[in-house]
A protein has these predicted regions:
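Alpha-helical adaptor scaffolds
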Residues: 125-206
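Terminal, low-structured helical/coil segments at or just beyond the last alpha-helical repeat
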Residues: 229-267
Length: 267
């Protein structure tokens, strides 16, 4: 009995370890073939996932050299720096005063990020426009991003989320419509960004549509390890009867299933 009761726990662990081993093999192959992509990032057990992402992004940029790959490397470098700062308790700007392999890795990552930031300031890639607007407060990048509204260039969930964020205060109903459209762009098996779900719940709360705020809070709970918006907490602000709650819970379950199947349709 003991053996069989442990199998559900052991099998996911075995699968996880297998995936980690495969990823390690891929990174090892990249570093063997192109040592320069890895040499400046110390492999000391800290920030291992972020380090692997940077190496992989460097490799893809080396192979294809597109602006999208430049953005992905910039994003991964930023995450690596954030992790390294946390693990060393050293801010990047102060790191030049200290010497250690991990600090050297921070300096190398920061230097490459600064270089890519400068190189891409004229790019019209929507992700890079967002980067330069949010990181450099570049009004021209914001204007160029907004000019792409309604075009195929923004037909991705992450970009619709960003667009909805722009209109959240000035045109909340438009922001809500954009969030629903973002969800409709997911295919079967895609990882749903829970920020879209929490944004919908928050937007509906702002419109005093408490039933929908509760419903989307409930949906968000299925896509987060630690829910940012709790349907239980939302219930504190607005009393929801038992029958209504059951109906909303069922509607939320239907939405969750549609999102997982990639069949969600905006209302």
């Amino acid at each position: 009995m003991t053996l069989f009761s442990q199998r559900p726990l052991l099998l996911p662990l075995a699968c996880c370890l297998t995936l980690m081993a495969c990823d390690d093999d891929r990174i090892h192959n990249i570093c063997t073939q192109s040592p320069a992509l890895c040499a400046d990032l110390v492999d000391d057990g800290w920030c291992r996932h972020e380090r692997s992402d940077v190496i992989r992004a460097r490799y893809y940029l080396q192979e294809e050299g597109t602006d999208r790959h430049r953005y992905e490397l910039m994003r991964d470098l930023e995450r690596y720096l954030q992790c390294a700062e946390h693990s060393t308790n050293i801010e990047y700007k102060r790191a030049r005063e200290q010497k250690s392999p991990r600090v050297e890795g921070m300096l190398a990552a920061g230097a490459q990020l600064e270089q890519l930031d400068a190189q891409t300031r004229g790019s019209q890639d929507p992700y890079l426009l967002l980067w330069h607007w949010t990181n450099n407060t570049n009004p021209a990048a914001r204007a160029s991003f907004l000019a792409l509204e309604g075009t195929p260039a923004l037909e991705e969930p992450e970009l619709q989320l960003a667009l909805g964020g722009i209109y959240a205060k000035s045109e909340p109903q438009k922001a809500i419509a954009l969030m629903h459209h973002a969800l409709s762009l997911y295919g079967e098996g895609d990882k749903v960004n829970s920020r879209i779900l929490t944004a919908l719940s928050t937007l509906y709360m702002g419109q005093k549509a408490f039933d929908l705020a509760y419903q989307w809070g409930k949906v968000s709970e299925s896509f987060q390890e630690t829910p940012e918006v709790s349907s239980t907490r939302l219930g504190i602000y607005h009393a929801i009867g038992k029958e209504q709650q059951e109906r909303l819970d069922q509607a939320a379950a239907t939405i969750v299933e549609a999102l997982r199947q990639g069949s969600y349709q905006a209302p």
